[in-house]
């Protein structure tokens, strides 16, 4: 039976990435570190932790143990940081304060200068985790240029993605679709994840390659594919948590749910076709070489890893979600 959200129609033209053979070792290391920091003490947080560790093993299938540990910890940090805005256990003032402190950390690469008095322990613990990630990035990155881009893309994610997305949630009306996509793409932290993949692969691509228009567009597509697909996978979960800021909900302002879903899936698949066309264009150009191949493969693995995780994790398990939702009419026609 096909999935009601038609996730089987979201297509990626690459083989499923195999799970990294260092998964078990890295999981053990991460569980110990998070226990040391006092993170992931609740059952739902442990479930999230285990899911993201699995996702990391698919995003970085060829990484060594230390590289996989770094890449997975960064993805975990992104999920934890996003929870500061999403979870009710953090107050509005706390989320703003946490964002400012984290921005300061990315700009200075040091702990925040302000005291932690009055902050939730979860925020303090998250800052300690980020400092561990900084140290690992410095040890693994192939040169200061890559580290600088890593910090800059993370800062960009917060200022132009996470904070504006949080503001959307407090608006009386949903944003326009184009406005939403521009912010949501950055909120997905795709650019930062791609630089993370560079660090994992020990790459140091020159600036003219990083800024080549086709490559810039491929990075953007990677981010767009991930977040628009996620808006499909997470649709029911967001309904349960009364979060209407989702591309499908915005499309449903003018279309039926099924038509909105069709448009969303078609858009995601069109982006992937564009990605492949750009890749083929680069392959036929004088720019193509092994490091660029590895770099692009990192983007493909990021999209595929997110897909594998989204279609298997309990977070988006449709049967479980429908079991707890009070709304039996899951597919309203408008």
Curated annotation (Swiss-Prot):
UniProt binding sites for Mg(2+) 1: 82, 86
Enzyme Commission number: 4.2.3.-, 4.2.3.125, 4.2.3.126, 4.2.3.15
Chemical reaction(s) catalysed: (2E,6E)-farnesyl diphosphate = gamma-muurolene + diphosphate; (2E,6E)-farnesyl diphosphate = alpha-muurolene + diphosphate; (2E,6E)-farnesyl diphosphate = (-)-(E)-beta-caryophyllene + diphosphate; (2E)-geranyl diphosphate = beta-myrcene + diphosphate
Family annotation (SUPFAM superfamilies): Terpenoid synthases
Positions with a binding annotation for substrate: 184
GO terms under biological process: terpene biosynthetic process
Residue positions of motif D(D/E)XX(D/E) motif: 82-86
PANTHER family documented for this protein: BETA-PINACENE SYNTHASE-RELATED (PTHR35201:SF4), TERPENE SYNTHASE (PTHR35201)
Name of the protein described by the UniProt record: Terpene synthase 1
Organism of this sequence: Physarum polycephalum (Slime mold)
Chain's gene name: TPS1
